[in-house]
UniProtKB/Swiss-Prot annotation:
Enzyme class: transferase
Lineage: Eukaryota, Metazoa, Chordata, Craniata, Vertebrata
Molecular function terms, GO-annotated: ATP binding; magnesium ion binding; protein serine kinase activity; protein serine/threonine kinase activity; tau-protein kinase activity
Function as written in the Swiss-Prot or TrEMBL entry: Testis-specific serine/threonine-protein kinase required during spermatid development. Phosphorylates 'Ser-288' of TSKS. Involved in the late stages of spermatogenesis, during the reconstruction of the cytoplasm. During spermatogenesis, required for the transformation of a ring-shaped structure around the base of the flagellum originating from the chromatoid body.
Gene3D superfamilies per UniProt: Transferase(Phosphotransferase) domain 1
Name of the protein in its database record: Testis-specific serine/threonine-protein kinase 1
Post-translational modification: Autophosphorylated.
Amino acid sequence: MDDAAVLKRRGYIMGINLGEGSYAKVKSAYSERLKFNVAVKIIDRKKAPTDFLEKFLPREIEILAMLNHRSIIKTYEIFETSDGKVYIVMELGVQGDLLEFIKTRGALQEDDARKKFHQLSSAIKYCHDLDVVHRDLKCENLLLDKDFNIKLSDFGFSKRCLRDDSGRLTLSKTFCGSAAYAAPEVLQGIPYQPKVYDIWSLGVILYIMVCGSMPYDDSNIKKMLRIQKEHRVNFPRSKHLTGECKDLIYRMLQPDVTRRLHIDEILSHCWVQPKARGLSSAAVNKEGESSRAAEPPWTPEPSSDKKSATKLEPREEVRPEPRAEPSPEEEMATVQVSRQSEAVGLPSEQPSKTEEGAPPQPSETHA
């Protein structure tokens, strides 16, 4: 029995193809019971790899069944046929995904970015409170409803965190996701804290929201990792970002996992909190204070305001004190992550080169 006939028997009228891979595809469908369109993910067990069938698919099904949050794509039904096909009926993101939205309309104004980022962060807090981690946060996995609200989707790499006998979360060893959104510890191929990994990806997403470009160029992973570990972040001056917004991004893109923000600290950050009240404010831990030493706020380096004749735009660069080059032992390990910046069609920002011992000059990029 073909997919259309299977869905018809379950009360769905199959529509157009929304996406397709080697062993899974997503179709739109009209639900005769719900009286609106849905998305149906169809997975063919006969074509899927063993690792996916034994580990990732059971995790995804278990987690989808337990999640219920206004900013997470709803799962209406999961069923399987005798010929080995799994059907996951989900809420449809009628306005597409955030990446296409930004590619079409450009970077978001801070107020719009604040609203969407608060919705996303609230969804991540909900997951983390359940000890669920996503591990593949990226703009393509953030769908938009009819009112352009964020809906977190694609829990294919998600998992429930395990705890040891003392109650501490155990480290993850599966290196997954997209390189452009991956934290330094993941790129190095070492066991990592999955909740902390999610926070780094949130920082990349917020940067893309307000800048319309990638914070790092993943065409050279080794170079990108070095820049990340030096805690260098560039911001386009033309966007006129507030210091509070830059500060939040800078703290999320912290290479030191012991100093990277927690989700409660993000939701209580001064950029998110003042104007986020009323937007799922119950998810915000207003009284939560960090027990860690406070990191100094972001401050730009002094730089020239001159622009080049080729209409290149100065960049404000954030960078700490110079550090020694990494030792051979710190070189990046090979990990199974995909390059992202070329595929998504967004430019990436790179810091400018400076002479040794000289103060950094403003980076430039095409306007």
